[in-house]
């Protein structure tokens, strides 16, 4: 592999930009819905995001799991796995996306009710969920192709695809929500069309014949599918848990502060989604590098990549917290169409507490990706399940009972801090194995 420092910056810079772009799908909807529909639209969007997170999580699990195995096989020159893995992953993606598509056509309303939509928000939530579920095959195939193209030596093309999808979403959001007056439906259509354009950009990889992965005739292999799921499980848990946490927070906040509290949380959660994407960008950027180094047994380079990744994570955490702390008022005001003082107060206070979580999030996300990339899916799964479910759910109920809405804002910072302890242990344990 070429100079490891140059490779790190090549992959990580492209992926941070790309992931920020990808995360702006929902942030753009948040902004335009806030301005064009109002607080009920924000609430409806926030209620819809958990099902989006689950769908997106499955796509990332298959994409990251399949691409990680593909990259490791490239590193150790296992040509049989290289030939088969993409086809297995694509078939699995189409299976799951078909289920979501059918649910979008037949069950959007009951799903909305299950997610907490009430009389004021049911129609808006149903409109949004129905449209993006129908477009699930494009969302999931886009995730799959982004991961494989990145691991096939084209991180810049993956970045361009993600940014194209994001910018087109912003433009179409504006056109469909305002000039066309489609409101919630327009925002959903803009988001749904974005992965289609992203896939068109990714097709350049095949048109130029730069691809080393192909479709081939194979028998479905349960063993290979389970291997993909194991290596990608941490990505699934991160996405699914964020959806479950959002659903749980929505319900708790509804009881504490009503719809206006959920709207305020929607602002916080969607800004947090963009900030989290920076750490996801670092982790997904180092994944192909670490996987190939692991396949070649280049353990010294893996240590160097980890040092760079953690340094970048800490620097970004400090900078992002300072920016959101100092400018919290104008940031919240941008999403508050009616200048509601209650929404302003709840969201600004929440940002100051909630965003301390980023001091620890990067370490935990990068560690989970490092463990998956070095063929330690069990440890990555343990770390992710503690972040996503084991600690955060009881912590949310306990802290909200003790401190009200401030307890909600404290839940993730405390959870991520606790998870950092086993994360450091797993890193040290794995690196010691490399020294043997």
Feature annotation, model-predicted:
Residues 24-43, 112-119, 175-182, 243-270, ...:
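Helix-terminus/linker motif at the lipid-water interface of multi-pass membrane proteins
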């Amino acid at each position: 592999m070429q100079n490891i420092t140059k490779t790190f910056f090549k992959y990580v810079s492209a992926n941070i930009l790309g992931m920020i772009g990808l995360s702006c799908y929902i942030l753009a909807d948040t902004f335009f819905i806030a301005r064009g529909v109002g607080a009920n639209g924000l609430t409806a969007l926030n209620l819809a995001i958990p099902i989006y997170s689950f769908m997106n999580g499955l796509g990332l699990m298959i994409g990251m799991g399949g691409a990680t195995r593909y990259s490791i096989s490239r590193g150790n020159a296992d040509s049989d796995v290289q030939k088969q893995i993409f086809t297995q992953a694509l078939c699995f993606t189409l299976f799951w996306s078909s289920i979501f598509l059918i649910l979008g056509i037949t069950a959007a309303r009951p799903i909305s009710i299950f997610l907490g939509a009430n009389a004021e928000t049911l129609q808006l939530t149903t409109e949004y969920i129905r449209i993006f579920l129908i477009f699930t095959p494009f969302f999931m195939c886009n995730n799959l192709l982004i991961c494989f193209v990145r691991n096939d030596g084209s991180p810049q093309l993956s970045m361009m695809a993600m940014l194209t999808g994001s910018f087109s979403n912003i433009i179409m959001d504006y056109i469909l929500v305002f000039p066309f007056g489609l409101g919630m439906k327009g925002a959903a259509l803009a988001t749904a069309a974005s992965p289609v354009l992203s896939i068109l950009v990714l097709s350049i990889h095949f048109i130029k014949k730069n691809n080393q992965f192909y479709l081939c005739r194979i028998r479905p292999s349960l063993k290979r599918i389970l291997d993909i799921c194991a290596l990608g499980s941490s990505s699934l848990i991160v996405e699914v848990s964020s959806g479950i946490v959002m659903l749980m927070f929505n319900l708790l906040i509804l009881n504490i502060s009503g719809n206006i509290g959920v709207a305020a949380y929607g602002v916080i959660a969607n800004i947090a989604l963009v900030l989290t994407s920076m750490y996801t960008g670092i982790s997904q950027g180092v994944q192909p590098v670490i996987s190939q180094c692991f396949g070649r047994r280049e353990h010294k380079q893996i240590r160097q990549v980890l040092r760079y990744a953690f340094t970048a994570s800490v620097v970004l955490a400090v900078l992002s917290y300072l920016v959101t702390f100092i400018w919290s008022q104008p940031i919240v005001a941008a999403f508050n169409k009616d200048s509601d003082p209650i929404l302003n107060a709840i969201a600004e206070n929440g940002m100051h507490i909630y965003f301390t979580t980023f001091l620890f999030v990067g370490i935990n996300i990068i560690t989970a990706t490092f463990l998956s990339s070095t063929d330690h899916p069990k440890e990555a799964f343990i770390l992710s399940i503690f972040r996503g479910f084991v600690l955060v759910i009881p912590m949310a109920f306990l802290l909200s009972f003790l401190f009200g809405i401030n307890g909600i804002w404290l839940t993730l910072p405390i959870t991520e801090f606790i998870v950092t302890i086993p994360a450091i242990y797993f890193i040290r344990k794995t690196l010691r194995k490399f020294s043997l």
